[in-house]
Amino acid sequence: MLIVTTNDLPGWEIQRVCGEVFGLTVRSRNAFSQIGAGFKSMFGGELQGMTKNLAESRNEAMNRLIAEAHSRGGNAIIGMRFDTTELGDVWTEICAYGTAVQAVPVTDAAKYTASQLGYGGAAQAPAPAPSAQPQTYGAG
């Protein structure tokens, strides 16, 4: 699935707006990693346990976002953003959101991108159903 943070898709024609979509996950923070983070913050350095947890949470939110876009008939998401909220002292909410659209590549560059994404023909929309394998985004 083509996912962009911009509000348009250069080289693509948006034929239908499928609606706002989001993927959400709420995670509890491990008390032991928080204690370790407290010590680490006194001396500086990356909080690797918390970084790993955040990356996993973002991946889960993205996979849910993609599933929602597919269920609405979209083959692309525009205006994608992340929102992170702390709920109390022990929970973190991660939300990935954007607008699902049906888009068709119209330039050669966009047609190449479509072929790399497995869209098949240049005018194919929507994209194939999501695979059983979750996708991984960003560091992690």
What role is predicted for each listed range?
Residues 8-9, 14, 44-48, 55, ...:
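Short capping/connector residues at structural and topological boundaries
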Residues 1-31, 92-140:
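N-terminal presequence-like segments and the immediate start of the first folded domain
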Residues 76-87, 108-118:
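Short, conserved loop-to-beta-strand elements that form functional interface hotspots
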Residues 21, 26, 34-81:
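Short, well-ordered alpha-helical segments
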